Amino acid sequence: MTNQKISRDVHHLAHRMSGFQESSRIVPEEAPIAMSYNGTTQAVMMATPGDLEDFAIGFSLTENIVTRIEEIEALDIVAFESGIDIQMKLAKQPEQRLSARRRFMAGQVGCGLCGIDSIEQALRPLHPLEECSTTFTTRDIAAAVASLGAAQALNAKTHATHGAGFFRPGEGLFAVREDIGRHNALDKLIGAVAREGLLAEEGIVAITSRVSVEMVQKAVMLGVPVLAAISAPTALAIRTAEAANLTLVALVRDEEFDIYTHCGRIIEG
């Protein structure tokens, strides 16, 4: 394991109405993070070098490399001058899934579909979420998104990171994760929820970004019934959420928002 700085104070020259002046600003760190399984690098992504164990677990789950945490028998975080290698040892069964869905990604910031070598992999079928009687109020949606923004400590300093949070009605946020990449932030959150053994079907995932199809895929893999976002969804994200029985809420502004799929889970209150 290794502790990595996630932000840095940078001195720079600023231009204001009064002219040029010396200034400083806290900016997020960015580093290449390699996901390696049984001695082979599977993916390399640019990410904020924090909450790396959560990141590795969440990525492994949402990529269907593992189906439960116990299939990762060991996890080591090794820092090099050029980046960080998260080295995982898998049980025997996940190795078959790994070879079937091998992908290599490099150079982009949390690119959710980078390096996938076929359309079938990019739009892989999802098992629809099970029907449940759980409902959430309009206040729950507003509170989930509002509390996420207030809990983003790194973004408060840098104004440069995405956030993802898991919210349970009546209890609040259980986990918040941040990253320069929106996909990375969600993977980190999914890893945190899995590590804590939280019941995903009891809560809402809130995100501070737009909703692309990859964000829907990750939410469905977690098993959460509602995904709520500050920004708008894509048409493909809406179609995917509809098919997967996920309630997709977007453009959340206090208690005003749009519900695109499976509206029955959201009630007035």
Swiss-Prot record:
GO molecular function, one term: sulfur carrier activity
Subcellular localization: Cytoplasm
GO cellular component: cytoplasm
Superkingdom of the organism of origin: Bacteria
Active site, UniProt feature: 111 (cysteine persulfide intermediate)
Keywords noted in UniProt: Cytoplasm, Molybdenum cofactor biosynthesis
Signal peptide: none
InterPro entries referenced in this protein's UniProt entry, alphabetically: Cytidine_deaminase-like, FdhD
GO BP: Mo-molybdopterin cofactor biosynthetic process
Protein family (similarity comment): Belongs to the FdhD family.
Role description: Required for formate dehydrogenase (FDH) activity. Acts as a sulfur carrier protein that transfers sulfur from IscS to the molybdenum cofactor prior to its insertion into FDH.
Protein name stated in the entry: Sulfur carrier protein FdhD
Gene name of this polypeptide: fdhD
